[in-house]
A protein has these predicted regions:
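A conserved acidic beta->alpha catalytic loop
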Residues: 89, 102-112, 128
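Conserved donor NDP-sugar-binding/catalytic core segment of glycosyltransferases
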Residues: 158-191
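A short, conserved alpha-helix in the catalytic core of glycosyltransferases
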Residues: 226-252, 256-285
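Glycine-rich, basic loop-to-helix element that forms the pyrophosphate-binding segment
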Residues: 125-143
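Short, flexible, basic/aromatic active-site loop/helix in glycosyltransferases
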Residues: 197-233
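Short aromatic/hydrophobic "clamp" motif used to bind/position activated sugar donors
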Residues: 148
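Short, acidic, metal-binding catalytic loop of nucleotide-sugar glycosyltransferases
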Residues: 88-97
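Active-site-adjacent helix/loop segment of glycosyltransferases
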Residues: 9, 269-347
Length: 355
C-alpha cells in the first residue's frame, strides 16, 4: 500500500484515459538502473531520443528527478525487527519529501511505537484488526500528497528504488499503478507482476505448480518474460505498490471485503477497468524478507487466502448462468484449502525403535 504532478498526475486532473481496453502508450524519460541501461517491453519503448542521462552527484548517488510529495503507508501486525529495517532503508530510497504512516492492526508489543518515534513516522489505529486493505486505507485517509506508496513492513528498499519507481510513473503515459522488482532474501526474483487469474489459468497453476513448476499455466499466471523490461502486467504484488493520488482516490483504495490476500489482484483489475495501466519497473528493486508474523499461524493464513480467492472469482464469474461454475470453483478451492491445512499441520515426532 506520492510525488510531483508536473506531468499531469498530482493535484491537477488526471490525464485523459482511453475507453475500454487500456492503450499501450510509450514511456518517456524513465530513470535507468545503476548500469545505465533501461530495457523496455515491446510497445513500451521511449519515443524521446533526448531522454536525460543519469548522472552521479557529488556524494556518489545518482541524480534523479525530484518532483512532488509521497506518502508511504505500511500495515503492521506484531512485526519484528523487519519494521526497523524497512524504515531505515526507506531513508535511502528517495530524496523526495516522504511522509510515513504506519497502520497498527493490533500489535501486542511496543516495537511499532518505538520504531515510529525513532524514524519520525506516524502511527494510526482504530483499535481493531480489520485486515490489510482496511489498514492501508486507514493510513491513507485524508491523502494530501501527490503519490501514495503501499508497502509491506518486511521489505528492504535498495538505494534510490522509490525515486526510480516514481520517476517511471511520472513518465509512463496512463500509469495507474506501479510496482518494483521484488527479490527474495536469497537474491532470486519473485514473480511480482502477473496476469489476472482466470478459471483455467488458476486451476492449471494450482494443480501443477508443485509438481511441474515450469508448466504453461503457471508461466502465464506469473507473466514471466522480459524480466528486465518496463512492461504492462495484469496486477502487481501488494508487497510494494505506487499509485498517483488521483487514481487512488478514484478507485477508493483497497476493497476492504478482502481481509488478507487478493486485495492487490482486485486493485489491479479495477485499475485496468478504469483505463489505467499496471506497470512493473524492474529498475526499482526491493527485497521482500517475508516476515514471520503470519508464518506462526499458517492455518489462518491458508484459510484467509482461499476465502479471498473464492470472493474474487465469484466476482469474475458473477452472471446467473455461471452459478454452476461458481459452485465447482468453490468446491475445488475448499478441497485444496483442507489439503493445504493438513499439510501445514505440525507432525508429531517419530518414536524411536524399540530395542
Amino acid at each position: 500500500m506520492i510525488f510531483a504532478s508536473e506531468t499531469g498526475f498530482g493535484r491537477g486532473a488526471p490525464p485523459s484515459r482511453p475507453r475500454g481496453r487500456t492503450r499501450l502508450l510509450p514511456n518517456r524519460n524513465v530513470a535507468a538502473p545503476a548500469d545505465g541501461r533501461v530495457r523496455y517491453a515491446h510497445g513500451m519503448e521511449p519515443t524521446d531520443a533526448t531522454a536525460p542521462q543519469i548522472q552521479d552527484s557529488q556524494d556518489g548517488r545518482r541524480a534523479v528527478q525530484r518532483r512532488g510529495t509521497v506518502r508511504v503507508v505500511t500495515v503492521a501486525y506484531n512485526p519484528g525487527e523487519e519494521l526497523v529495517r524497512f524504515l531505515e532503508s526507506l531513508g535511502r530510497a528517495s530524496r523526495r519529501r516522504v511522509r510515513v504512516v504506519i497502520a497498527d492492526n493490533g500489535s501486542e508489543h511496543e516495537i511499532v511505537r518505538e520504531a515510529a518515534e525513532r524514524f519520525g513516522a506516524e502511527v494510526v489505529t482504530d483499535g481493531t484488526n480489520r485486515g490489510y486493505g482496511a489498514g492501508a486505507n486507514l493510513a491513507a485517509r485524508d491523502l494530501g500528497e501527490d503519490w501514495i506508496v503501499v508497502a509491506n513492513p518486511d521489505i528492504v528498499w535498495r538505494p534510490d528504488s522509490l525515486d526510480v519507481l516514481i520517476d517511471a510513473g511520472l513518465n509512463t503515459a496512463g500509469a495507474g499503478c506501479l510496482g518494483p522488482r521484488l527479490l527474495n532474501p536469497d537474491g532470486s526474483v519473485y514473480p511480482s507482476g502477473r496476469a489476472l487469474p482466470t478459471l483455467v489459468r488458476g486451476a492449471g497453476h494450482a494443480a501443477l505448480t508443485r509438481v511441474w513448476p515450469s508448466n504453461p499455466f503457471s508461466a502465464a499466471y506469473h507473466s514471466q518474460g522480459g524480466n528486465d523490461a518496463v512492461r504492462e502486467v495484469g496486477w502487481l504484488s501488494g508487497a510494494c505498490l505506487a499509485l498517483p493520488a488521483p487514481v487512488w482516490r478514484e478507485l477508493g483504495g483497497f476493497d476492504e471485503g478482502y481481509f488478507m490476500f487478493f486485495e492487490d489482484v482486485d486493485l489491479g483489475a479495477r485499475v485496468a477497468r478504469a483505463g489505467w495501466r499496471n506497470v512493473q519497473v524492474p529498475a526499482a528493486i526491493v527485497v521482500h524478507e517475508q516476515g514471520a508474523s503470519w508464518k506462526a499461524r499458517p492455518e489462518r493464513m491458508i484459510r484467509a487466502h482461499h476465502a479471498s480467492a473464492r470472493r474474487y472469482l465469484d466476482g469474475v464469474y458473477s452472471a446467473p448462468w455461471q452459478a454452476p461454475l461458481r459452485w465447482a470453483v468453490d468446491g475445488g478451492l475448499r478441497l485444496r484449502e483442507e489439503l493445504e491445512v493438513r499439510a501445514s499441520a505440525p507432525r508429531p515426532p517419530r518414536r524411536g525403535r524399540r530395542k
